[in-house]
């Protein structure tokens, strides 16, 4: 798919294989956020950077990659922030994305854009009415769950009226 995107001029977010939202359940149930991984755990950092480097080295020559992503649904914290810094050092020409800062603002500079999953169009408008510091991208905004892709036009219509709304990814 990378070669096809390169050939046809389609943009991609290349996302590190990191997802740990299962660790959130215990944290939310108990209020003890030490359960969340990788978060700020030094023992995870080398593994996280190795994973980022492996993806970067494998994919760095694909012009279709517009954005590096630090992973999916892994909360936030210093370890993921360090991943974002790795991408910035290695490739300052591309943007860095991470949705998890929405849940943990302590490392808000991890992502070059505001990114949320499945917000309503009204929630996007409300957010951008208060915070215009970064462009807004829906890293996931529709699939066959919930309203089964209904009202998708409301998201695409928003790109006509809100210059900081950059669309999204399905």
In which residue ranges do the predicted regions lie?
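Substrate-binding/catalytic cleft of secreted carbohydrate-active enzymes
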Residues: 1-170
